[in-house]
Regions:
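Rhodanese-like catalytic fold shared by cysteine-dependent sulfurtransferases
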Residues: 2-9, 16-39, 45-46, 55-87, ...
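Structural scaffold elements adjacent to functional motifs in cytosolic proteins
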Residues: 48-50
């Protein structure tokens, strides 16, 4: 009887652990500007978030991006309105702020997080076109 209880407890524990793993991102994927370009080109409804300031975003940004600044106090409140079950792509100027944003998104339960390596500067150096 003790063994049966122990086995049942292990099965229940494994069930809850496996469910937890499916609800949050396993890792944040650092991807190249070319990979972001391909994703944006193939899906104009992509959750693409520029985490720079409003002023930086106003100077230039990727065509379909929305601006949610990671240093604003309401960052979590704003990103909470996005779909946690859909892939989300983030970028900033050089990659530091988007890395921080990606970590926050992971903590909030986003399942598929992509961080553009090198940020907007890297995008520009690659001569990619999907800019505003």
């Amino acid at each position: 009887m003790k063994n049966l209880t122990l086995v049942f407890g292990l099965v229940v524990s494994l069930f809850f652990l496996s469910c937890k793993e499916n609800t949050t991102a396993q890792q944040i994927k650092l991807i190249s500007p070319e990979e972001v370009y391909d994703a944006v080109r193939d899906n104009q409804n992509l959750q693409l978030v520029d985490v720079r300031t409003k002023d930086e975003f106003g100077e230039d940004h990727l065509k379909t991006a929305q601006n949610i600044c990671v240093t604003d106090d309401d960052f979590k409140e704003k990103v909470a309105k996005l779909d946690k079950n859909e892939p989300i792509y983030v970028y900033c100027r050089s990659g530091k702020r988007s890395s921080n944003a990606a970590k926050i998104l992971k903590e909030m339960g986003f399942k598929e997080i992509y961080d553009m390596e090198g940020g907007f500067l890297n995008w520009e150096s690659q001569g990619l076109q999907e800019k505003n």
